Design a protein with these regions (language model features):
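Conserved acetyl-CoA binding element of GNAT-fold acetyltransferases
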Residues: 122-135, 184-187
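Conserved GNAT acetyl-CoA-binding A-motif
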Residues: 147, 154-167
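Conserved acetyl-CoA-binding loop-helix of GNAT-fold acetyltransferases
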Residues: 130-133, 139-152, 176
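Short amphipathic alpha-helix that is part of the acyltransferase structural core
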Residues: 23-78
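Conserved beta-strand-loop-alpha-helix junction that forms the acyl-donor binding cleft
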Residues: 163-172, 180, 187-190
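Conserved beta-strand in the GNAT
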Residues: 95-99, 105-114, 132
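Glycine-rich phosphate/pyrophosphate-binding loop shared by adenosine-nucleotide-utilizing enzymes
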Residues: 44, 103-109, 126
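A short helix-loop-beta-strand connector motif used in the catalytic cores of GNAT acetyltransferases and
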Residues: 71, 81-97, 127, 185
Length: 190
């Protein structure tokens, strides 16, 4: 894996690629249209992750969240297809991205995955993960729009709850998104 460069989004004017010209990880119609209406005034667009988004800076945006090594385009695409294929099984991964219409580069990303359970009469729980907004775009409400999209995807899929883990510093933000503190997260890294 190559280390990720922390360069800002490309500022050249590449033509915006419409959803219909992309191989998306799930149907774009599942994302509420009102979110794109809100983003349009800022020349931004929300959609599912596309098979070509490695080249649009997906790893760069994730690097604004945590340390990320770039696996290279081939390995990235293999993971894309693995996750997109999961959307035909009980476990589903919905990865949303926000794209600049000026540059056709990603500026934010987030994931919700659906976990089938034996609890609650074979219910499903949604887990929100990897909310990342490019450092140059933070403070503009993009994280809140991602959380709204991912929560809606979870609810439309029938999840009985949607949960996420966050640092104490981010609790006020997630409370604004309608989430409450429940329990305590434990982790063991290998």
């Amino acid at each position: 894996m190559r280390p990720c460069s922390f360069s800002p989004p490309i500022s050249s004017t590449m033509p915006f690629t419409p959803d219909s010209d992309l191989e998306l990880s799930f149907p774009a119609e599942l994302i509420p249209t009102d979110l794109n209406n809100r983003l349009a005034q800022h020349n931004l667009h929300i959609r599912p992750l596309a098979s070509s988004d490695h080249g649009r800076g997906h790893i760069r945006v994730l690097a604004s969240l945590t340390s990320v090594a770039d696996p290279g385009e081939k390995a990235w695409r293999e993971r894309f297809y693995e996750l997109a294929k999961s959307n035909t099984s009980a476990s589903k991964y919905y990865i949303c991205v926000i794209v600049s219409k000026e540059t056709d580069e990603l500026v934010a990303t987030g994931t919700v995955f659906l976990e089938p359970k034996f609890l609650r009469s074979l219910a499903t729980a949604g887990h929100i993960e990897d909310i990342a907004v490019d450092t140059s775009m933070q403070g503009r409400g993009l994280g809140k729009i991602l959380i709204s999209a991912l929560t809606t995807l979870s609810e439309k899929a029938g999840a009985y709850k949607t949960l996420l883990d966050c640092s104490d510093d981010n609790v006020p933000f997630y409370k604004k998104c309608g989430y409450d503190v429940k329990g305590l997260q434990m982790s063991k890294y290998t």
